[in-house]
Amino acid sequence: MKKIYPTGLPFLFFFVSLSMTTAQAPSITAATPSSGTVEQWGKFEVQLDVNATWVNPYDYDEIRVAGTFTGPDGAVKSVDGFFMQDYTVSNQQTGALTNVGNGRFKVRFSPDKPGTWTYVLTITNAAGTGTFAPQTFEATAVSPDDNPGFVRTDQTNYLHFDDGRQYIPVGENIAWQATNPYVDYKNWLTKLSDNNGNFFRLWQCTWGLGLEWKNGSNGYLGFRKYKQNNAFYTDWLLDFCAEKGIYIMYCLQYHGQVSTNVNPNWSDSPFNTVNGGPCANTWEFFTNATAKNHTKNRYRYVLARWGYSRNIMAWELFNEVGWTDQFEQRKNDISAWHEEMAAYLKANDPNRHLVTTSYVNEYNDPNTWNLPDIDFTQTHFYVETPFLERTLAGGVRSYLNDYGKPTINGEFGLSGSGAGLGALDPDGIHIHNSMWGSLFGGGLGTGMSWWWDNYIEPKNLYYHFAPMSAVAGVVPFHAANMAPAPASVSGVPADLLMTPTQGWGALSDTSFIINSDGSVTSAGAGLGQFLYGSEWNTQHRRPPIFYVSYPVSGQFKVRTGSDTGQSPKIVIWVDGIKVLEQNAAVNQTFTVNISAGQHVIKVDNSGTDWVTISSYTFSGLGSGVDAYVLKSENQTRMAGWVLNNSYNHQSVQSGGVPAAASGGTLQVPGMSNGAYTIKYFDCLTGAFLNSAPVEVANGALSVNLPDLLWDLAFVVEDQSVDVAEIPEPLHFEVFPSPTVPGSAVILEVDTAEKTDLQVTLLDTSGRALHSQSAGSSNGGRQQISFQLPGDLPGGLYWLKMTDGKRTSGTKSIVINR
C-alpha cells in the first residue's frame, strides 16, 4: 500500500450575510453572464446579485440558488448554483492567491446542443423563493479537434466521447500537489500533455485540493464550509485541462478518512464524535443519516461548481474503500452506501458523468461492482516483480470476465513505497511494460503509475506516454468492440515464471494447470503472495498445487520475497513425496529437480508463521515472448503487443540489454478465414514500421514475428475492409555499428519529396539524449552525418528520424568505449 504524507495549505474563507430587519422572500437583483455565447459542451457561467439572508451559503438546506435551462429542442435541465469566494493568481511563480470581493453566487451549465437556450434563475431560503426573469444565451457548434464532449460508456469494453470518437486514457495518478497546486499542476500537466498524455487521477484529500475537514485543521472550518482557495485552484485546474485535452478521474473520498489502521486520519475527521461529528465509530460513516446528508451536501456543491466540466471523466466515490475499518464485517453497509451515493450523483448530475470506486484488489466486493450505477471497475496492484504487466493484464481480464464492464488499472507500483524506485528502475521500463500490457490486456486505458512526484517527475519519464498514445490512436478499440483473446508465441523457449499477486488474507487459488503452450489455467491474479505456516494465521492457509508436464527433465524453483514472519519452513512435494524441507529466509531460492513427464507439485510452509513468495519457476515451460492480444467482436480485426520478456527492469539493471528474441511464431485462434494485413508499430516512437500480408486458415492466425529486442505493437485488418490510411513509414539505415563516442555515424534515408529532417539519439528506454537537425532534403536517397556526443557510456542506443509529418521506427546502434 502506498504511503501518504499530509502537508498544509493556507486557507481563505469568508462568511457572507446581508442583515435584514424583517424576513422576506429572497430575490435575485441582477444576473450577469460571462458571455452571451458559449460552445456546445462548454462552460456557461452567470453571476448573481441577490437580496437574501443566510448564515452558511454552502448549506443547501439553508439557501439554494438554481437554474433551469430549456434547450432549442425543448428539453429541460436543472442545476444547482453555488457560493464562491473569487481570487486571482497574484504571483505566477509561487501560485499565491489574492481574494477578489466578498463572495457571491454563481450558476454554471454546459449546453449539449447548439442553438438558443432559455434559462430561469431562482433563489430559495426559509422565507420563500425569488425568481429572476427568463434570459437567453447562444450555444455554437463545436470545434471538433478541441471539444469532443463528455466521456461516455456503452456495451463495449471501452469509452467514447459524445461525438462518437473513442477515448483511451493514457496517463498517471497526480492525486495532490507537492507544494502549490497552480505551480505543480501547471508543470506536471504541461509535460503530460506535451507527451500526448490525456488522463490523470485526482484526490479530494485534506492535504491536497480537499473541501471539508475538521474545524481548525489546516485551515478547514468543518462541515458544509468548503475551503475556497482549494475550490478556486480546482476551477483553474479544470480550465487548464480543457485547454490541454486532459481528463480527470476525480476521487471524492479516500480510505484514511474512515480508518484507524491504514493511513489513518479518523482522529481529525469532522465525522468523529470526538470532533463534534455524528459517528462514534468509523463504520458509522456509511450508515449514519446525518453523515450521509453531509456527504450529499458536499456532492451537491461539487456537482454545482464542476459538474459542467467535460474534462471530468468520472466521479470516483472512494479510494481503496477496502482499507476502511472492519471492511469484511461491514461489506453490506459499504455496498449500500455506494448504491445510494452513486444513485445520488446520477440523479443530480445533468451531464451524466461516469461513476466508479476502487479497492485494493483482494479486498473488493462483487456486490458493489455489479451495481448498475457503477459504470466501470478498476484494479490497484503493488507487486515486486519484473513482470508487473502480467499482473495488471491478469487483473483486467479477470474483472472483464467477472463483471462485464469496462475496467482500468487505476494504480500500480513495484511496491507500496516509492523509496528507492529511481535506483531500482531509473528509466521507467516497468512503466512502459505495464502501460502496454494493461491496455492490450483489455483495459479501457493504460495502467496508471502511482508515483508521479517522486519518480515520474524527477526522472522525467513522461516520454513513455507519447508512443503509447500514438499507437492507441490507430487501434479501433471501441469501434471494433475489442476483447482479450488467447494467444501464444512458440519457437522462443524459456522458463515459465509465475508471480503471486494476492495479498494478506486473500482467498487465493490453490490449483493451477500448466498447459503445454506455457499458459496457466487459474493464472489471473489468484496466486497468494503469503505462504502461511502451520501454527499461526492458519485460517489463511491455501498452499498452491501445480499440475504440470515437463517435456524433458528440468527444475522447479521457489523464491521467497522480502518479508517473513517467525520461523517459516519451505516444503516441496512432488507426486505426493516430500523432496525438500528447509528453513526459509527472505530472498532465497529453493530448487528441486523434476523428471520428464506429468507431475503434481505442491508447495507448503511447515514452519511457525508466514513467508512471502516472489515467484515460482518451471524450467523450459515458458516462452521468451509474451503476447497480449485483443480481437474484434466479429473476429475480423485484431490488435496486440508482443514483448521480449527478458527486457524488464531487473534484467536490464543487472545484466544490461538482453539478446533479441528470435524465431517466434504468434498463434491466435478464433479468427475468420481470409486475407489480412498485419501492420507493425514501434513502441519507442509510436511510428508505423511496415506491413505484410497474412492468410488466416482453419480459423487461426499464425505469424512469424520479427526479431524482438524489446517489443512491438501490431494491428491485423481484413484486406476487404476499408480502413484508415496510415502514412508510409520513414525508413533509414545507420552505419557503422558498433562505433565510439564522439564519432559521426551515417544515416541513409530515402524521401519522396523535399523535407526537413531531424535525428534524435535515444537511450535504451526511449529517453531522448541528443537531437540534431539534418537540414533540408531535396528528395531521393541521401546520406546524413550525425555527430554522437563524446560523453556517452558504452552500450546500446536507438536513433529515430522525423520529417515533421512522420516519425521513423528506431534503429539500434552499439557504442563501445
Residue ranges and their predicted role:
Residues T53-V55, S415-S417, I431-E581, N593-A692, ...:
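Aromatic- and carboxylate-lined catalytic core of secreted/periplasmic carbohydrate-active enzymes
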Residues N297, V321-S469, A659-A661:
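Extracellular glycoside hydrolase catalytic/binding regions
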Residues I123, V603-N605, M801-D803:
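Conserved structural position at the C-terminal beta-strand
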